[in-house]
């Protein structure tokens, strides 16, 4: 079977995602019914994390265990990567010892170089540019609650970060619209927006205008990992971009709210919203587990018809 990687959302086509969502539903149901499903017995996942994580690490580690395999966690302190070993050399060695690899790092180029030299599938657990596993879970969560996402309007409020970039990629594949509202100076980079085209993306100055008639409102922290030295500046710049009840009232009545977590109540979102009836944040977080199990199964076994 040809080795496939999941480094950006665009690495798969719509039919593949629809298959993954179908598998996710089945795998999640088996999990909820306490039925054992071990298709990855004796398979090993290596998790190489340069960035700290709660949800990504836990969902991959628990997910691999629940599929019958095992997982090994490696921080940069645990490998020669943190001591200057070439990425290419690390990939050649590690991929001879495990069956699949998840990497969480800063520069997207690092994960691309690793994948080019890997004998096994590589999954992007997060880079500064993209977070495809998050959007995989987000779209599945939307479908669970509202059905097809095609033709819907997704509004992103806040920093145009890796999650925002991945939403733009997904819009091209699933044919939905993305409204983005950021403070001046934090807009989606023109070159990056050009990669996704303009048919599915629109930039707004006012967050209230951006959420008008939205089917989903989503946001993230104002200060991502690696930008801690900008904390005070960003708090000032993003002061008008807190998703509160007034802002949500501009969206459709049945609009959902999502946040990839961790959340800072009173900053990017009010407690009234994230803990309110429109929030599906906890389902979204749980679905990281189930969508990633389907992803690992697909990358290692291809299409299967277990029912």
From Swiss-Prot:
The UniProt entry, under PROSITE patterns, shows:
CARBAMOYLTRANSFERASE (PS00097)
Keywords attached to this entry? Amino-acid biosynthesis, Arginine biosynthesis, Cytoplasm, Transferase
GO MF assignments? amino acid binding; ornithine carbamoyltransferase activity
Pfam families membership: OTCace, OTCace_N
Which Gene3D superfamilies does this chain map to?
A: Aspartate/ornithine carbamoyltransferase
GO CC annotation terms, alphabetical: cytoplasm
InterPro entries of this UniProt entry?
A: Asp/Orn_carbamoyltranf_P-bd, Asp/Orn_carbamoylTrfase, Asp/Orn_carbamoylTrfase_sf, Asp_carbamoyltransf_Asp/Orn-bd, Orn/put_carbamltrans, OTCase_ArgI
* Predominant localisation class: cytoplasm
* Known pathway: Amino-acid biosynthesis; L-arginine biosynthesis; L-arginine from L-ornithine and carbamoyl phosphate: step 1/3
Reactions this protein catalyses = carbamoyl phosphate + L-ornithine = L-citrulline + phosphate + H(+)
The positions annotated for binding L-ornithine are 162, 220, 224-225
* Location relative to the cell: Cytoplasm
Alphabetically, which GO biological process terms does the record hold? arginine biosynthetic process via ornithine; citrulline biosynthetic process; L-arginine biosynthetic process
Is Transferase set as a keyword in this record?
yes
Q: Which residues bind carbamoyl phosphate?
A: 53-56, 80, 104, 131-134, 260-261, 288
Give EC number(s), comma-separated. 2.1.3.3
Query: What HAMAP family does the entry give?
Result: OTCase
Family, per entry: Belongs to the aspartate/ornithine carbamoyltransferase superfamily. OTCase family.
Matching NCBIfam families: orni_carb_tr, PRK00779.1
Physiological role: Reversibly catalyzes the transfer of the carbamoyl group from carbamoyl phosphate (CP) to the N(epsilon) atom of ornithine (ORN) to produce L-citrulline.
Q: What name has this protein been given in UniProt?
A: Ornithine carbamoyltransferase
**Which gene is annotated as encoding this protein in its UniProt record?**
argF
């Amino acid at each position: 079977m040809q080795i496939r990687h999941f480094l950006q959302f665009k690495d798969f086509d719509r039919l593949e995602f629809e298959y993954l969502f179908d598998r996710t539903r089945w795998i999640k149901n088996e999990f909820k019914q306490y039925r054992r499903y071990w298709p990855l017995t004796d398979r090993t996942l290596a998790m190489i994390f340069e960035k700290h994580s709660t949800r990504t690490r836990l969902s991959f580690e628990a997910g691999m265990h629940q599929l019958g395999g095992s997982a090994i966690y490696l921080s940069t302190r645990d490998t020669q990567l943190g001591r200057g070993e070439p990425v290419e050399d690390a990939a050649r060695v590690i991929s001879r010892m495990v069956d699949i690899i998840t990497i969480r790092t800063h520069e997207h180029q690092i994960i691309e170089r690793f994948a080019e030299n890997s004998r096994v599938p590589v999954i992007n657990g997060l880079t500064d540019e993209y977070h495809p596993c998050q959007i995989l879970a987000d779209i599945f969560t939307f479908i669970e609650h509202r059905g097809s996402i095609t033709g819907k309007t997704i509004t992103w409020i806040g920093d145009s970060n890796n999650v925002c970039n991945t939403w733009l990629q997904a819009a091209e594949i699933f044919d939905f619209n993305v409204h983005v509202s950021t403070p001046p100076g934090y807009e989606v980079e023109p070159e990056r927006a050009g990669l996704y085209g303009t048919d599915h993306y629109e930039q707004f100055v006012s967050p209230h205008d951006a959420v008008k008639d939205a089917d989903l409102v989503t946001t993230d922290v104002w200060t991502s990992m690696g930008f801690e030295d900008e904390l005070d500046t960003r708090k000032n710049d993003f002061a008008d971009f807190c998703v509160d009840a007034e802002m949500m009232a501009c969206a459709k009545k049945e609009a959902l709210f999502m946040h990839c977590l961790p959340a800072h109540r009173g900053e990017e979102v009010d407690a009234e919203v994230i803990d309110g009836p429109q929030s599906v944040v906890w389902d979204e977080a749980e679905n990281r587990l189930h969508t990633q199990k389907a992803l690992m199964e697909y990358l290692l076994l291809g299409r299967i018809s277990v029912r």
